[in-house]
A protein has these predicted regions:
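Gram-negative bacterial Sec-dependent N-terminal signal peptides
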Residues: 1-22
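Outer-membrane beta-barrel biogenesis signature
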Residues: 15-51, 120
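Short coil turns and loop connectors of transmembrane beta-barrels in diderm outer membranes
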Residues: 18, 31, 80, 124-130, ...
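Gram-negative (and chloroplast) outer-membrane scaffold detector with strong preference
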Residues: 24, 36-43, 72-146, 204-215
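Outer-membrane beta-barrel translocator domains and adjoining extracellular loop/strand segments
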Residues: 47-54, 95-103, 142-151, 188-195
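Predominantly the C-terminal beta-signal and adjacent terminal strand-loop region
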Residues: 48, 93-97, 171-215
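Aromatic- and Gly/Pro-rich amphipathic surface segment
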Residues: 55-73, 77-79
Length: 215
């Protein structure tokens, strides 16, 4: 959570600076496109039990570390208030099996988790413009590297996301942005070599801060 807190703090500083400096600015409106470039923390909330393929307890749980990445988001406003946003970026995570006397790396893997959200912007013509959204995501696990004699398969799949954020005008088409998403995603992780599996609820917090440009 330390990286998430750092990204959120940086984003709040950006938005406060933007609010203080904003003079003439371009408001949100129907037909507007917005490109957002952000620094994003992805912090999974894993910790589910690892069982044998027969369902017996092993006393271990699956943990997944956080990572920080650059992300790109593109929004299109259908009306002054309603927009759709697509974001993409990729992170690298380590899956670890943990127990009372165990702390073993199982796999390192890259994750591509694009999210498509439908948003409602409450004050499109204001300098400080908050919004909420909801959407779907698809988790793609790729370029994995197994560790310590494990052979782990992690299933790709769909999840859904809730979102809240704020855009603060800086100057002209430029704005500062803070965005928080909660992604709900569950997957199966199977170790083919050792005959164990885990149904892992990743459910990451996705916290971003950056700048947007309207065109």
């Amino acid at each position: 959570m330390k990286t998430t807190a750092a990204v959120l703090a940086a984003g709040l500083a950006l938005t406060l600076a933007g609010a203080a400096q904003a003079q003439e600015f371009q408001p949100k409106a129907a037909g507007t496109k917005m490109l957002n470039v952000r620094v994003t923390s992805v912090d999974p909330e894993a910790g589910d039990p690892i069982t044998t393929l027969a369902g017996a307890a092993t006393g271990l749980r699956a943990e997944v570390n956080a990572d920080v990445m650059p992300t790109i988001g593109l929004s299109y406003f259908f009306t002054d208030n309603v927009a759709v946003e697509v974001i993409a970026g990729t992170t690298k995570h380590t899956v670890t099996a943990k127990g009372p006397a165990t702390d073993v790396k199982v796999k390192e893997t890259w994750v591509l988790p694009p999210v498509v959200s439908l948003q409602y912007h409450f004050a499109p013509t204001a300098k400080v413009s908050p919004y909420v959204g909801a959407g779907v995501n698809y988790m793609i696990f790729y370029n994995g590297s197994d560790k310590n004699n494990f052979d782990l398969d992690i299933d790709n799949g769909f999840g859904f996301a809730l979102q809240a954020g704020v855009d603060v005008a800086v100057s002209g088409p430029w704005s500062a942005n803070v965005d928080v998403k909660k992604v709900f995603f569950e997957t199966d992780a199977t170790d083919n070599r050792n005959g164990v599996k885990s149904k892992v609820k990743l459910d990451p917090w996705v916290v971003s801060a950056g700048f947007g440009y309207k065109f």
